[in-house]
Design a protein with these regions (language model features):
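Conserved beta-strand positions in the central sheet of alpha/beta enzyme cores
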Residues: 33, 74-76, 110, 149, ...
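Flexible loop residues that form catalytic
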Residues: 37, 80, 114, 210, ...
Length: 288
C-alpha cells in the first residue's frame, strides 16, 4: 500500500505546499494529498496555506514535486454537492480541477456531500441533484482518465444505504470511494462493518483516529471530522483501523493510505506515520 498524507495536517502551522513537500522528502513519503483553491487567496499567496491553487501551472507543479520525489495520490475538491449550491458552485469547481489534475499527474479527485441534511430540499430531491451533478462530472472525468471518489464525510455519505445509491449514480469505472476510518466512526457507524460492505469500491483511504474526548462529545452527532488532533494509533479508533487494514489487505487493495491528523508542525503526524508503518509491517502489508 502507498503511504500518503493530507496537507491539512499543516494548516495550523501556516506552512506552504512546498513546506509539506519538504516534510515528505525528509520522512521518505512519496505521495501527497491536498486541497485545491479556485482563484487567488491571500493566505496561499503569502505562503501560509499548504494547498495548491488552480491558477498554478500544473506541469510546473508536477516537475517541482518530482524534484522532491513526491506525486499526488489525490486532490481534494470536496465542495458539498448535496445542497442547492452544489450544481452552481461545486460542479464547476470539480470540473475546473479535472484537467489540472490530469496535467499534474494526479489520478484522483475527492468529492463529497454536506455535513447536514440540505436546507429546502428533501432527501430524495438532494439525491436527484447529486445524481445529475455526478453524471456531468463523470462525463468529463472519463475523458481525462481521472477517478472521482466519493468521500465519506456528510449526511448522505455516512449512511450506508444512501452511499450505495450514490456509488451507482453513474455506471463508470471512474466513480469510486474514498473510505475514511474516522468519519465513519464519528458518525456512529462501525468502520469495520462499513468497509466490509464497500471494500470493492475503495479507490483511496483516509486513515484517521479519534480521541476519547471527541468520541464522547460528538460520536453519533457529527458526520465528519475537520481535523483530528489525535495521533493515529493513540485514539479509540486504533483497533478499527488495524482491522480495516486487514480487510483491505485481504481484498487486494494496494492503493493510497492518506494520513489525516493535525500535524502541529510535525510531532503529531510524525508519530502517526511511525504507527502506520509499524502496523503495516506487523500485518505483512507491503508499503511504499
Amino acid at each position: 500500500m502507498q503511504i500518503s498524507f493530507h496537507t491539512d495536517a499543516f494548516n495550523s502551522a501556516a506552512w506552504s505546499f512546498e513546506d509539506a513537500l519538504e516534510w515528505a522528502q525528509d520522512h521518505d513519503v512519496h505521495r501527497i494529498e491536498c486541497g485545491v483553491i479556485s482563484g487567488p487567496n491571500w493566505l496561499h499567496g503569502l505562503g501560509y496555506h499548504p494547498h495548491i491553487a488552480l491558477y498554478e501551472d500544473p506541469l510546473t507543479m508536477k516537475k517541482k514535486m518530482a524534484d522532491y520525489g513526491v506525486q499526488f495520490s489525490q486532490i481534494d475538491a470536496a465542495y458539498p454537492l448535496s445542497g442547492l449550491n452544489g450544481p452552481v458552485r461545486g460542479v464547476p469547481y470539480v470540473l475546473e480541477s479535472i484537467p489540472w489534475a490530469s496535467h499534474a499527474g494526479c489520478p484522483r479527485i475527492a468529492t463529497t456531500d454536506g455535513l447536514h441534511a440540505p436546507e429546502k430540499l428533501s432527501d430524495e430531491e438532494a439525491m436527484t441533484v447529486m445524481q445529475r451533478s455526478y453524471a456531468q462530472i463523470l462525463e468529463v472525468a472519463e475523458q481525462y482518465g481521472i477517478h472521482i471518489n466519493i468521500e465519506l464525510h456528510g449526511y448522505f455519505t455516512t449512511n450506508p444505504d444512501m452511499l450505495e445509491r450514490m456509488l451507482n449514480f453513474v455506471d463508470s469505472p471512474y466513480l469510486g470511494l474514498n473510505f475514511d476510518t474516522g468519519n465513519t466512526f464519528i458518525s456512529g457507524q462501525d468502520p469495520v462493518d462499513f468497509l466490509r460492505r464497500f471494500v470493492g469500491d475503495v479507490n483511496h483511504v483516509h486513515i484517521k483516529d479519534v480521541s476519547e474526548s471527541l468520541a464522547a462529545a460528538a460520536r453519533g452527532e457529527d458526520t465528519g471530522i475537520g481535523i483530528s488532533h489525535c495521533s493515529i494509533g493513540e485514539g479509540v479508533n486504533a483497533d478499527n483501523i488495524r482491522e480495516c487494514l486487514k480487510i483491505l489487505r485481504d481484498n487486494g487493495y494496494d492503493g493510497p493510505l492518506s494520513l489525516e491528523c493535525e500535524g502541529k508542525g510535525g510531532p503529531v503526524i510524525n508519530k502517526s506515520l511511525e504507527w502506520v508503518r509499524t502496523t503495516l509491517d506487523e500485518l505483512d502489508i507491503p508499503r511504499e
